[in-house]
């Protein structure tokens, strides 16, 4: 049985697993560390045309996904996995972060409702206690790409996905890690000199204490310059 099971509700089932079928996520899928089901929302559509949307009350441009259709889809999904949490990628949602990802993984069964068109009827969110989640202050065509992004983050946190699980502690945003929630330091590899640019000599010194201090100071400088709001937590 997989550590994490995901149910994805979408009108474009062919978009999955997409990039999650490759590299670390793909290998983890093959090894059954995580698993997923796809439910095609159109299978629950109305009329012979399988309509899932309609005009908005109160006017406005765009079509809204119907609550009766989505309700039937969600009820079916919940019948397969009772103990689960429903997430809806939306620009109105709480911003997805590394800490948010860890919180999500407290549930071993997760449902993603991928919206399309102008969005979904608000009553669906209220009825099923749906958690809206945002991947940033920009608009995409639907919820599938944010779902892929969020899942990639979740999957690499699962035990057995990374060859060396300790690498997680030296990444950006890890509050309990080397950089204490800040951005990662600059990274270098061979050759020592490339296009006239040399690797910082301290990294070649072999002095682990000096190197660790350099890495932490670099992290603070980069965080202060690029993401100063993160420093309040440091």
Swiss-Prot record:
S-adenosyl-L-methionine binds at residues 115, 135-140. GO terms for molecular function: tRNA (guanine(37)-N1)-methyltransferase activity. It is an enzyme of class 2 (transferase). It is found in: Cytoplasm. GO terms for cellular component: cytosol. It catalyses: guanosine(37) in tRNA + S-adenosyl-L-methionine = N(1)-methylguanosine(37) in tRNA + S-adenosyl-L-homocysteine + H(+). Pfam families: tRNA_m1G_MT. Its EC number is 2.1.1.228. It comes from the Bacteria. Keywords: Cytoplasm, Methyltransferase, S-adenosyl-L-methionine, Transferase, tRNA processing. One of its GO terms (biological process) is tRNA N1-guanine methylation. Specifically methylates guanosine-37 in various tRNAs. Homodimer. Belongs to the RNA methyltransferase TrmD family. This is tRNA (guanine-N(1)-)-methyltransferase. The gene is trmD.
């Amino acid at each position: 049985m997989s550590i994490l099971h995901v149910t994805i509700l979408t009108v474009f089932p062919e978009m999955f697993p997409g990039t999650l079928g490759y590299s670390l996520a793909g290998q983890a899928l093959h090894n059954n560390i995580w698993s997923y089901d796809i439910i095609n929302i159109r299978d629950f559509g109305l009329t012979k045309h399988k309509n899932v949307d309609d005009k908005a009350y109160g006017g406005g441009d765009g079509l809204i996904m119907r609550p009766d259709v989505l309700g039937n889809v969600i009820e079916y999904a919940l019948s397969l996995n009772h103990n689960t949490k429903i997430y809806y990628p939306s620009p109105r949602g709480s911003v997805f972060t590394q800490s948010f990802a860890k919180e999500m993984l407290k549930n071993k069964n997760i449902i993603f409702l991928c919206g399309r068109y102008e969005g979904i009827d608000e009553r669906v969110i209220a009825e099923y206690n749906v958690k809206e989640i945002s991947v940033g202050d920009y608009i995409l065509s639907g919820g599938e790409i944010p779902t892929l992004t969020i899942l990639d983050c979740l999957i690499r946190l699962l035990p057995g996905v990374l060859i060396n699980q300790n690498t997680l502690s030296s990444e950006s945003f890890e509050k309990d890690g080397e950089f204490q929630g800040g951005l990662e330091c600059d990274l270098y590899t061979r050759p020592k000199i490339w296009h006239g640019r040399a690797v910082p000599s301290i990294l070649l010194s072999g002095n682990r204490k000096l190197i660790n201090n350099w890495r932490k100071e670099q992290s603070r400088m980069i965080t202060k310059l690029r993401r100063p709001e993160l420093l309040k937590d440091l």
